[in-house]
Amino acid sequence: MPTLIVLIGPTGVGKTELSLRLAENFHTSIVSADSRQLYAELKIGTAAPTPDQLKRVPHYLVGTLHLTDYYSAAQYEQEAMEILHQLFTEHEVVVLTGGSMMYVDAICKGIDDIPTVDAETRQVMLQKYEEEGLEQLCAELRLLDPDYYRIVDLKNPKRVIHALEICYMTGKTYTSFRTQQKKERPFRILKIGLTRDREELYDRINRRVDQMMEEGLLDEVRSVLSYRHLNSLNTVGYKELFKYLDGEWELPFAIEKIKQNSRIYSRKQMTWFKRDEEIRWFHPEQETEILEYLRLQNLTHLPSLDTF
């Protein structure tokens, strides 16, 4: 049966190298589940696969969009499922990897069939947000859809705005479209989670930020400065350096904030992933144990322990 190996874990844990090794040994491809690696302009700050890594293993949904392109989790689900359908005609196993929780869920569970927001409604809501602010939009959401108001992250403007767009466009609550029924997939899903001790993970995150700065992250941020108003750049590593370029923060302070916010994000990721009882957790260096786990799932064409 076609099998999707879903390799997940917090930022900086070491997903990239292990995903490459798995894909190489299964002679297959990698589909990205990273909402920021989609953008061609964002390479260093998103830890996108390097040219050498892209040569080692074919990757999909990396660098396919530009910053001005609108893209939703529902669009990701549709495009990724089309890619997987094609890949499974050629491979028994495909690897999906990334840390964007909603994108992983889009493939493993499916996205509710929520109407696509038309351009006019989107423009109206963005203008309301700019003129009235998030607090006023939250107040409107409380009146129009109190059930969703109670569970949504009220500090996330994208979520609040999208819910209001649906309310205004359809005359129905956003909640009424959220069936949250898991979709059946024509392939088996094996979820492998990577984790490290907190101190070890935080040290890796800190060192990775330093490496990004050495590789030219500041120049990359300068190159997208004119697009800073876009949601795609409301991203750790970019929003902090925007404040440095504005003269609001000193560079060392901005770098420390990137590290701090990356650590906070890693905790949010782990909180999300820990709710999923289907994930089997390993340390990234437990390659032998991971391979043995896959062997027990009756996968054929497994690499030998000696070559992995």
Curated annotation (Swiss-Prot):
It catalyses: adenosine(37) in tRNA + dimethylallyl diphosphate = N(6)-dimethylallyladenosine(37) in tRNA + diphosphate. Keywords: ATP-binding, Magnesium, Nucleotide-binding, Transferase, tRNA processing. Transmembrane segments: none annotated. It is an enzyme of class 2 (transferase). ATP binds at residues 9-16. HAMAP family: IPP_trans (MF_00185). This is tRNA dimethylallyltransferase 1.
